Amino acid sequence: MEYRNIKYGTKTERRNYSKMNYDIELPNLIEIQTKSFELFLKEGIKKILKDISPIESNNGDLKLYFDDFYLDKPKYNIEEAKNRDITYYAQLFAKARLENVLTKEIKESNILITELPLITPSGTFIINGTERVVISQIVRSSGIYFTKKFDSKIRYLAQLIPTRGAWIEYEQSNKDFLYAKLDRSKKIPLNKFICCLGFDTKEKIESTFGYNKFLDLSLKKDQILNINEAIIELHSKLHRGEKVPVDVAREFIFSKLFYAKKYDLLAVGRYKFNQKLDVLKRIKNTYLAKDLIDPETNEIFLSKKTFLNEEIIEKLKNKRNCFTFELVNADNNLENEINEEILTYANYNKDKILELYIKDNIINIKTGEILVEKDTLITEQVMNIIRKNGQFIHDKVSKYFLCNKDLYQKHKERKGVFNEVLEVYILDNLGNPKPTIKVIGNIQSENNKQHITVSDIIASISYYLNLYEDIGKTDDIDHLGNRRLRLIGELLTNQFRLGLIISEKNIKDKMSISKFNNITVNSLVNFTSLSAIIKTFFNSSRLSHFMDQINPLAELTQKRRVSALGTGGIDRDRAGIEIRDINNSHYAKLCPIETPEGPSIGLIASLSTYARVDKYCFIQTPYLKVIKNEQGQPKVSEHIDYLTADQEEKEVIASVTYLNSDNTFKEKKIIARKNGETGLHEIDKITYIDVSPKQIVSVATSSIPFLEHNDASRALMGANMQRQAVPLLIPESPIVGTGIEHRIAKDSGCLILAKNSGYVTYADAQKIVITEKPKKTITINNEVIYKNEEEFNYEKAKILHKKNVFSCQTEYKLINFAKSNQDTLILQKPLVLDGDFVNKNDIITDGPATHKEELALGRNVTVAFMTWEGYNYEDAIIISEDLVKNDIYTSVHIDKYEIQTRELKKGAGVEQITREVPNVSAEAIKNLDERGIIIPGSEVKEGDILVGKITSQGMVEQTAYERLINVIIGEKSREHKDSSLRVPCGEGGIVQSVKYFSKENNDILPPEVNENIRVYIAKKRKIKEGDKIAGRHGNKGVISLILPKEDLPYMKDGTTIDIILNPLGVPSRMNIGQILEMHLGIAAQKLNIKVATPVFDGVNNDDLRKIIKEAKLSLDGKMTLYDGRTGEPFDSSISVGVMYMIKLSHMVEDKLHSRNIGPYTLMAQQPMGGRNQNGGQRFGEMEVWSLYAYGAANSLQEILTIKSDDIIGRQKTYSAITNGLPLPKPSIPESFRVFAKELQALGLYVELINSKTKENEILKSLVENQKKGSNNR
């Protein structure tokens, strides 16, 4: 049997034509968002607070600790936050402890850090009432990268990149000298940089790194300095030649590279450093040049000339101590915080610290007072004197007392630099050994250090030098092994750190000028800068997007989107082809098809269907492990491993292939990938196999049936256009699907899922109540309602519901007539009835663009590929009038209109909502309630009043006549201006709801706003000429004609065609999938079945023939059609079938626009552009040329002057028309005046002499010209 009948959810069954023996369940498609945010709450905040704690005052007297944090409960739930236009957030508090170092006094308090926006269960954020999504950013991982530069000769560049901190780079000049750069500063010779690390002689450098001709060249050019001189020179390069003492230079370099607060690799950076610098990763296929001695036994572990293959390297992994050596001693180790110079001042014996005598006087620099004389016994009292005056003391030892450092602990931590060193050689083309090469790696055990170490730097220099000896390999920056995702958790962590650094500085400044007794923790701490940064991130970051809520697929795709743009990412304008292009490592991780068309192409991608991220945020994808069966044959097991791009490199991974029933391979050789290359491999060498054919594409792309028959660019359009589908009034799932429709609907967040199993005890359009089995005996008023061991059935559940036992009931509120971000309708409909039993995670409602638990973006319609009177020329589409009458493509849209009353300045008047609107008829206010607000359910059209509002103008100086009239007729002394909210031009519909907020009701409103009224108007949009519809294969078009049913072509049985498509739209576009879908669709419709044809693994030609035969249709998929106008058959057979067509959001009603009188731009005084500004149509340069061509001088003059920006001419023309006079000659256009002013601003003298008056018109103001114009009239 070629197919299996599979049930998707509880409502839909499809005939699935997949040939795979295994079917791996898709992971949760939005967990990438929710899990990351949960991790941020659990670990991210704690780590940041730990990093900044304690904050210490400049004089060391006060310390502020952040011990713990907690989140308060949100004040408003998700629904309330949306209704009130506020952010769904929780207040983040921390337990702060202020400690006085001298007196050991402590003050504690819970302080508010910020209001933290919370993620919703569907992976979104509610910011100011609107749903937003923070998309993931793909960036280069911190780590070490070696790249090859091609010039006249090959050169290499090395970059040591942290997550936060100074970069280190090595490069080769045109003259072959080697240089190093720290923090993008000026270059320093590499040998001097090596000298800074503790190598003070040429011999020591050569014995450590071995002979390298380029390093030797650098050593000959630059004289080796001692270590201190090298450190001073490195500091001067970083500070533009500034010379400082060696201890200051050493301390600065220490803080730059080895201080955790300024240099951070994160766990991912340490992982990448260790991966790259492992000595055993570099020596494969080389020969050992020297015996390896086991230090434990003093015996030879490996003899020289041993060929280092994978097996030998595995042995070496457990004997790293055989090749671990100290390269730099503790005294010269740049990483040691306490150097030899400081240690000479102090006695290291802990018992004798108080007997230490100071060798020099300690002086207060500010006053010159001797605080402690030399040879004074150091007691606790003396130490307190040092602490109190610490900011005026420069002595090194006193500084360490002041900062309360534990000298002994620091001394204990002092150690030398250890590295793994192996000496190897390789063979030349003739098989002779080349000179010995020293390969140095870092210490792999230092996984906990998240800053760079001297061992790392030495190993990176060795790797760089080894590249010139053909050992090691360069990196592909675009490989996904070198790029990782920054998820919402990490992005928020970065923003938090940025805000806390600013706050830390402010707190330090306050601590330095405050006394412990006069301050409280709350007065000291101010995190307003953090709150501002968090708000800015969610409101205006390039990674925080206004949620695409038009349909469930658009929502889901946006949550799984990956962007290379944004802070710390790539600039769109400077991104080249290489970074936009598809890389072989993208396989099954990033979709090769779905990306935007336009300037962002290749920079924004989507995760593949099965992709997820590991703990370092590298993208992983699952593979099935290939094992040997009892007969020793390779067999696909059920064990799944998730692999990153780096881990895939060493495996042989087969593409999905057909298997025998026992999961062994049918062929001896199959297509597989190794090291990014695809080829034929023997099945014995296969280690993994893909879990599914659809794992290489994204969710949107995998919903396109017959994807494998479409050109890639058309598939891209198909995937993108599905996200633009408008939810229809009557949705219908596709007859021809791919089987993923159910999962898209379930994970999108648009539907309601049952939290627990139970019986439905109440269901209507507003809410659903599910009663679960109680976990204990229920007793009410001494009456046992339910015993724990009893069988639980619907009758018991109904009793519990009637008795209001809320502990075992879950209520689900349905969304009714809500407005989406794109102004479409969000409506949830119950799928369950009273008495139904539901399991946990079952879908209990349908939502927008879903039908019976499946995605339903469009409708299944009968299509024919034929021409009809030229109306479907150039992708135009002809549709049946039935599609309009029967609401097949009707959609509902909701518009929001808002008005506020504000507190105006004193004397400026008052704003109020009222029904008493001046100068309007009773008809205009008939639908307003007593407050002056439109009644829900009213039908409104363009210009109707929605909310009556008047603004009473401030007191004005009245004439004697006005005062007399007011006294006689009793009028108020101020005028009222009508400022009502009206339906805008071109809009209308039925008032769906009204929301009223006011400060009197204690609603949250901006300070100057008293009332806020929102009116929601719903309107049905039927499909019409000019609307855009499309299939799922990139086949799109605009409706050019709506034909009556009687004029349309019809089949032999009288069935009329719904849509006529142009057959010329198929061959050149190479999207043959639409033809196959059409044939399969009509066959499935005849058989009254639904089909699932998964991508790359669906219905093939043989299957299609069998289905067509089963449906008793012609094998060529064509049939005779009859002309509806004449009844005569068309000359030849026509391809007819059923295709799934969707209505796109590009509707003609949003674009149709006309202008009679409208606004003008302030500067140029030309008509505004665009529909929103009631603008005119631009008459541009090319249009002017066309009038030139016809010699239409008068029309051209009118268009360029009085119809555009000739202000005086406009007024004269209006006056002439109203008085029946001939049109006057035009004046100077305002744009010409602006141009002349620009020339004058450049210092040029401009004249425009009037031939009659001989005056310079440019120097005259517009007012003068207007006066002159009125005098002429």
From Swiss-Prot:
Protein name: DNA-directed RNA polymerase subunit beta
Methyltransferase among keywords: no
Subunit (UniProt): The RNAP catalytic core consists of 2 alpha, 1 beta, 1 beta' and 1 omega subunit. When a sigma factor is associated with the core the holoenzyme is formed, which can initiate transcription.
Protein's GO biological process: DNA-templated transcription
GO cellular component: DNA-directed RNA polymerase complex
InterPro entries listed in its UniProt record: DNA-dir_RNA_pol_bsu_ext_1_sf (IPR042107), DNA-dir_RNA_pol_bsu_external_1 (IPR019462), DNA-dir_RNA_pol_su2 (IPR015712), DNA-dir_RNAP_su2_dom (IPR007120), DNA-dir_RNAP_su2_hyb_sf (IPR037033), RNA_pol_bsu_bac (IPR010243), RNA_pol_bsu_CS (IPR007121), RNA_pol_bsu_protrusion (IPR007644)
Matches recorded under PANTHER family: DNA-DIRECTED RNA POLYMERASE I SUBUNIT 2
Enzyme Commission number(s) from the entry: 2.7.7.6
GO molecular function terms noted in the UniProt entry: DNA binding; DNA-directed RNA polymerase activity; ribonucleoside binding
Matching PROSITE patterns: RNA_POL_BETA
Catalysis performed (reactions): RNA(n) + a ribonucleoside 5'-triphosphate = RNA(n+1) + diphosphate
Family statement: Belongs to the RNA polymerase beta chain family.
Described purpose of this protein according to its UniProt entry: DNA-dependent RNA polymerase catalyzes the transcription of DNA into RNA using the four ribonucleoside triphosphates as substrates.
